[in-house]
Amino acid sequence: MTITSLNQLDLSRGGYTYADYLLWQLKERVELLRGRIFKMSPAPTIIHQRISMRLSGEFYNFFKGKSCEVFTAPFDVVLPSADGKEDNVVQPDLCVVCDPEKLADGKRCLGAPDLVIEILSKGNSQHDLGDKFHLYEQARVSEYWIVRPTDKEVNIFVLDQGRYRGLAPVVEGKEITSVKFPTLSIHTNDIFD
């Protein structure tokens, strides 16, 4: 049976995997966290899209000609659980992958990207600040940026002995500098209106 609607799935149960996810032909975008289905926000706002495009441009220009690659949503990132099950599938707004082996199948990133960016939107902030924060930490994503359009600030978290350590928020009018890629620096005026 072809799955074309979330109504055909049991959203209360877990145990779904990337293999299941690939069989679905849903109109809605979903993510899997620990085998559970999470509906993604509908089409992002104009502000979200502007920030995403500006960051994408900055990251593309920085990584052009380098070994790392930049990907934007929708792009599947599969983060296997400790038991090896592929039951975590997320679509970050932007991610940087430096290990070509993680891209070997040409369809997804299998394993932790080096840097992930999520842009908060109404309806996804708890998911990005809670569930996905812990998932990225557990998967050992080196650096996680949370962009807050309403506050015009960026929170950067870096992995330190297996746990995320938050840096001081980068506010409007300041420079955002990556810890993982220290020569990558973006002025907030270039991403926020």
Spans of features found by a protein language model:
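Gly/Pro/Ser/Thr-rich low-complexity, intrinsically disordered segments predominantly at protein N-termini
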Residues: 1-193
